[in-house]
């Protein structure tokens, strides 16, 4: 017999190895089939649930409107917009959507992700807004406008207070190796552009605080009432306040505050507390909202605690102009140009001025001379968060309109 035709008997060991391989292949095929079937059923069940569940119009956690079911039209089909709108609708209205978002965020943290939707996932449950890159052209425009305004009103005491964001003050809360600008230096660089303006950088006042209370909210980009109080107490001389109040009545307003960074990042579980500090023996006052034609007796709008953005408890949010008239009898009246950081700071200024006018240049488009004359303004304060000021385009427009 030809040796090439001779068959070598298969050994028992070889047959066992072959059988093990075949069994493993069958096991993997069954597992893949079961996994695929479970995933398919899971998707089908969630799709059916999503289809049967009425559409939500608003996501309180994300603080935004949700995509509604698109209507079918020839134009939409031909342009392809219908299919894109359908995909967005399905994503927005997916069953148990908030839980999936939270689960995804938990997974991201476990695998070492440092941020979610441009929000740093910090230590001790801090969510931190990134420091902005200064817009040098905008800053030159702002500095020129502020300098011109101060020169035009040289008879008034003009000051500016700039507050850094949490990432610049609490570097120990940042995730490892997270890049962050030296915002204190950015603030100082802007201050050097000013003339005729008493400038205060709040960075050191906040960094030097050794109190255990939070200076910033963990889920929001604003400072807390205590952070604002810290700057008020430490920076009072630079703000023209010779004798700051040192005793306050503290009140807890909320333990369920989910801020903008919680909404933006998808971190919905943790909640912040909102406290206020009312100066003892605070003079009587009233607040007038010109855009609403409404007068009230408190800075705090408690109805806002029932809404998503509970930070609006301070003055009800942002308005073009707010008037505060007090019984302080100091002979001084203050005009504040501001962003929303001032909303929780103004509570400390009540004892020091007879009148406080707050203008938000993002929404105010009238002339300023009439405001200054009608209210006997003696002092000007520009109060901004650094992340707003260093990329702002509205303040210069507002000031130049009245030049």
Task: Tell what function each PLM region has.
Residues 1-403:
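Extracellular glycan-modifying ectodomains
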């Amino acid at each position: 017999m030809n040796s090439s035709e001779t068959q070598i008997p298969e050994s028992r060991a070889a047959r066992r190895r072959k059988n093990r391989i075949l069994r493993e292949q069958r096991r993997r095929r069954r597992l893949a089939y079961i996994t695929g079937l479970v995933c398919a059923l899971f998707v089908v069940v969630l799709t059916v649930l999503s289809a049967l569940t009425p559409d939500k119009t608003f996501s309180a956690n994300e603080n935004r409107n949700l995509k509604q079911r698109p209507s079918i039209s020839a134009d939409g089909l031909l342009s392809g917009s219908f299919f894109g709108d359908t995909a967005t609708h399905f994503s927005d209205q997916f069953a148990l959507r908030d839980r999936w978002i939270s689960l995804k965020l938990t997974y991201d943290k476990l695998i070492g992700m440092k941020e979610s939707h441009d929000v740093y996932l910090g230590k001790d449950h801090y969510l931190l807004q990134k420091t902005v890159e200064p817009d040098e052209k905008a800053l030159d425009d702002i500095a020129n406008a502020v300098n011109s305004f101060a020169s035009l009103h040289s008879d008034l005491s003009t000051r500016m207070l700039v507050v850094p964001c949490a990432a610049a003050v609490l570097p120990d809360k940042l995730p490892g190796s997270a890049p962050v600008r030296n915002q204190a230096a950015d603030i100082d660089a802007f201050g050097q552009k000013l003339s005729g303006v008493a400038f205060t950088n709040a960075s050191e006042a906040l960094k030097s605080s050794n109190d255990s209370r939070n200076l910033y909210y963990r889920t929001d980009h604003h400072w807390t009432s205590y952070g604002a109080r810290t700057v008020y107490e430490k920076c009072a001389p630079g703000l023209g306040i010779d004798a700051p109040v040192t005793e306050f009545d503290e009140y807890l307003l909320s333990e369920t505050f989910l801020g903008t960074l919680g909404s933006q990042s998808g971190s919905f579980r943790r909640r912040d507390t909102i406290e206020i500090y009312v100066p003892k023996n605070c003079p009587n006052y009233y607040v007038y909202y010109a855009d609403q034609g409404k007068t009230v007796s408190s800075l705090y709008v408690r109805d806002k605690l029932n809404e998503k953005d509970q930070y609006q408890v301070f003055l009800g949010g942002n308005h073009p102009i707010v008037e505060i008239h007090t019984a302080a009898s100091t002979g001084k009246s203050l005009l504040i140009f501001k962003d929303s950081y001032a909303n929780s700071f103004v509570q400390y200024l009540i004892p020091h001025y007879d009148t406080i006018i707050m203008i938000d240049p993002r929404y105010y488009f009238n002339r300023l001379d009439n405001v200054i004359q009608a209210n006997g303004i003696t002092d000007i304060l520009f109060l901004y968060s650094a992340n707003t000021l260093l990329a702002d385009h509205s303040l210069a427009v507002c000031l130049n309109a009245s030049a």
